[in-house]
Amino acid sequence: MTENSELNNKISTIKLKKLIEIQNLTDNMNGTVIRIRGFIESITSCSSQIFILLRDRLEKVQCIIFKSTNVSSIYEFSRLKKLPLESFIEIEGQVVFAEIPIKRATKQNIEIVISTLNILGPVVSKLPFQLKDCKIAGKESDTNTITVGYNLRLDNRFLDFRLPVTQSIIKIIDQTMYTFRTYLRTHEFIEIKTSKIIQSGSEGGANLFSLNYFNKPAYLAQSPQLYKQLAIIGGLKRVYEIGHVYRAEVSNINRYLSEFVGLDIEMEMETTYIDFIHFLHSLFINIFESFKNEMKKELEIIRQYYEFVDLKYRSTPIIITYKDAVDMLKSKNIQIDYGCDFSREHERILGKIIKDKEDIDIFTIIDYPSSIRAFYSYIDETTKLTRSYDFIVRGEEILSGAQRENRYDYLKNAVIDKGLNPENLKNYLEAFKYGAPPHIGCGIGLERFLKAYFGFDDIRYFSLFPRDPNRIFP
C-alpha cells in the first residue's frame, strides 16, 4: 500500500455534503460546514498548524489544519506538511472569519478549518515546472525571478492550464466567441459548419496542407470562403461560422498559426459595403464592451502577468482609403508604390499614425486595388477598385473582407486573370449561373484579433494547443 493510500485510509471519511465551489464561498457563510475541492497551490506550517492555499479555477482560499484536531495523528500531521503541490484534494471544514485579511487568497476575509481531508488526485512525480515561476515574457519584474520558458509550458499544457492567467485568457477566448455568436444570432444569422477537407484551394497559392483522401489528392481548407458564398446563393441570406482554418505558412511563428480559429461572416448585400463596415464595427464594440463589463476579474489577472494598455475606440469607425494609407506612409518617407500590399511594418506605422492623429487603436482601410485582393472581390465600375476593407487593431490586420462578385462571366474572367484554373473551381463557378444574390462578408482570425487587442508579442497565448511549423504536440 502506498503512503498516500495509507494517509487516505487514516484520515476521516468525508460525508456526502453538497460540494461547493470556492468561487461561491461568501463572508456570510461563517460557521457553516462545507465541502470543497481544489489544487494545493502552497503549504506553510508551524508547530501546531498547517496552512493550505487551495485553488480552483481563478479562486483561492486558505485552509487550516490544527494539530490538536482529529484530522490526523502526530505522525500524520508531519506527513501532511509534505503533501506535494498541485495535489488535488477534497476537504470538509468550517468557514470562519479571518482575523487578518489573507492577501494571497481571493477569498480574503474567510478561511476553512479542516475537519476531514481526502487526496483525490495525488502527485506521484516531480512537476515539470513550478507554477509560481511562470510569467508572460515582457512583464517587468525582479531580474532574479525564475521564468519558465513558454515552450516548456506548452509541452506540459495541462499544467499550464492551471495558471490563473492561462485560464483567464481561455475565458476571454470563450467570451469573444460567445459575443460574436450572440450578436449575429440577434441579427438573424444562421451558424453553419463547412467542410475542412477540400478538393482545391479557395485563395490560390501554395499555402495548403495536402492529404491522401482515399487515394485522391485533397487539402485542408485555408478558408470557408467558397462554402459561405454557396450558402448565400442557396438562399440562407445570413450565415456565420466559427471553425478551424489551416495555412501552411512557414513564417514568423509569433504572428501566424498553422491551425487557427476563423470567425467568418457572409450575408446578402442589402445596402452598401460601407454600411456593412459599420455593422462589423458595432460587432467589435460589443466584444470590447463585453470584456469591460463581464471579464473584469480576468483582465485584472492578465495584467498581473502582462501590463497591457487599454484599447481605445469610438462608437463609429474611422475609415481611410487604400490611397490615403499609401499617402500617409509616403509622408513618413516610407518607400511604397501604389498597387503594393501593406507589409506588417506598414500596418504598424499606419497604426501609429492613426493613434497619434485620432487617439484610436482600431480603424478600417477600404478600396484596395484588385491586384492585391482575391479573385472573388467585386470591382467598382467607376473607381476600378475593389469594394474591400481591412480592419487594423494596434497596427495589425485582424479582419479582411469585401463585397463579392456575383456575376458569372465577371467571376470566371477574374479567376483566369489571377492565373487560376477554372476547372478546379467548376462546382463553385457553376452556382453563379443560377441567380446569385449580391453578397458580402469577411473573415476574422480569432487568435490574431486577441493578440492585437492585448498587444502581446506571441499569438500562441491565444490557442489552447497551438500549431506552428515547430509544434504538432501535445
Curated annotation (Swiss-Prot):
Q: Which reaction does it catalyse?
A: tRNA(Asp) + L-aspartate + ATP = L-aspartyl-tRNA(Asp) + AMP + diphosphate
Q: Which InterPro entries does this one have?
A: Aa-tRNA-synt_II (IPR004364), aa-tRNA-synth_II (IPR006195), aa-tRNA-synth_II/BPL/LPL (IPR045864), Asp-tRNA_synthase_2 (IPR004523), Asp/Asn-tRNA-synth_IIb (IPR002312), NA-bd_OB-fold (IPR012340)
UniProt region (Aspartate), positions on chain: 225-228
Cell location? Cytoplasm
Top-level taxon of the source organism: Eukaryota
Q: What is its EC number?
A: 6.1.1.12
| Binding positions for ATP per the UniProt entry | R247, A248, E249, R255, Y256, L257, E397, G445, L446, E447, R448
The record's listing under SUPFAM superfamilies reads:
Class II aaRS and biotin synthetases, Nucleic acid-binding proteins
Q: Which GO terms describe its molecular function?
A: aspartate-tRNA ligase activity; ATP binding; RNA binding
| Entry binding sites for L-aspartate | E203, R247, S400, R404
For this chain's UniProt record, which GO biological process terms are given? aspartyl-tRNA aminoacylation
Q: Keywords in UniProt for this one?
A: Aminoacyl-tRNA synthetase, ATP-binding, Cytoplasm, Ligase, Nucleotide-binding, Protein biosynthesis
Q: Which GO terms describe its cellular component?
A: aminoacyl-tRNA synthetase multienzyme complex; cytosol
Q: Does the keyword ATP-binding apply?
A: yes
Query: HAMAP family attached here?
Result: Asp_tRNA_synth_type2 (MF_02075)
- Subunit annotation: Homodimer.
Query: Which family does the record assign?
Result: Belongs to the class-II aminoacyl-tRNA synthetase family. Type 2 subfamily.
What this protein is called in its record is Probable aspartate--tRNA ligase, cytoplasmic
